[in-house]
């Protein structure tokens, strides 16, 4: 899963950098990361954070900034964390990992989520399954 995630993340970030090549140091691309860092799925979340950091290191750009939030494997906490990221001016979020945590994300229409779930049916309109 790590290799797939790193490949996807690097490809996506390179596309962002090409599209936003005029970004200045003061105007970085902000990307949210919603993962479980506590609870039963904490190890998976930690691996995703590690893969994200490796991908950022491989990209070698200071134009990307990752904002990490622990969702506790809880749909309500996921929604709350997504709103917090939105308040920071973030409009693209990687995660959540599990389908159950997508439950309320359609309430935030102007955010796009790149979910790591393998389910593709009945996703909210603002969720892209990788």
Where are the model-predicted features located?
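Second-shell loop/turn segments in exported
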Residues: 37-43, 68-72, 90-95, 126-130
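Stable alpha-helical elements in mature extracytoplasmic
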Residues: 40, 44, 48-55, 77-81, ...
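Short beta-strand elements in bilobed, periplasmic/extracellular small-molecule ligand-binding domains
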Residues: 58-77, 123-129
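Short, well-structured alpha-helical segments in soluble
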Residues: 75-91
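Extracytoplasmic ligand/sensor domains, especially the bilobed periplasmic-binding protein
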Residues: 92-130
